[in-house]
């Protein structure tokens, strides 16, 4: 009877290398997807922070021009049934030359620059004050580009 003595295997086979490479590539793809999702979430968070800063921007302008704010010259619309204030979405629609009109125009222009872009019709600002100086400011934008839930609203309440 013939006896076959196998030599012990040395090194790794090509299949083992390919399997290891496949597992590593899936891991790297998963890490890349996780990084992309984190970047989208970071962008969404940055927009929310910018919206808050921009609401303080118009509130500070109204504090400087308190008399006009109490005369309701900064109001952009009235409150509807869903709690939204009539917004301004286009700075060019504000044609007045008073300090209040200039402040609103500058505010909407800055909103578009920091959150959306000048052609964006979904980035809007809204202000509603009463004669006692109690004000609500809403900033709206579309967050779907950043993987968000669509229209976002940041609302700030303040007394002048």
Q: What residue ranges belong to the model's regions?
A:
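N-terminal signal-anchor/signal peptide hydrophobic helix marking the start
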Residues: 10-22
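C-terminal juxtamembrane segment of a hydrophobic transmembrane alpha-helix
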Residues: 23-45
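Flexible, low-complexity segments enriched in proline/glycine/serine and punctuated by aromatic residues
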Residues: 43-49, 53-160
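N-terminal leader/signal peptides at the extreme start of proteins
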Residues: 1-12
């Amino acid at each position: 009877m013939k006896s076959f003595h196998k030599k012990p295997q040395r090194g790794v086979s090509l299949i083992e290398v390919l399997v290891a490479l496949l597992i590593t590539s899936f891991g790297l793809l998963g890490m890349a997807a996780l990084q992309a999702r984190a970047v989208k979430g970071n962008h969404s968070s940055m927009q929310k922070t910018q919206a808050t800063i921009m609401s303080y921007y118009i509130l500070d302008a109204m504090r400087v021009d308190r008399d006009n704010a109490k005369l309701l010259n900064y109001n952009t619309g009235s409150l509807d049934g869903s709690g939204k204030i009539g917004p301004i979405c286009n700075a060019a629609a504000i044609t007045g030359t008073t300090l209040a009109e200039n402040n609103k125009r500058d505010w909407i222009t800055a909103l578009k620059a920091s959150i959306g872009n000048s052609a964006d019709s979904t980035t809007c600002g809204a202000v509603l004050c009463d004669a006692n100086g109690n004000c609500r400011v809403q900033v709206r934008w579309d967050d779907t580009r950043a993987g968000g839930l669509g229209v976002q609203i940041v609302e700030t309440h303040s007394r002048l």
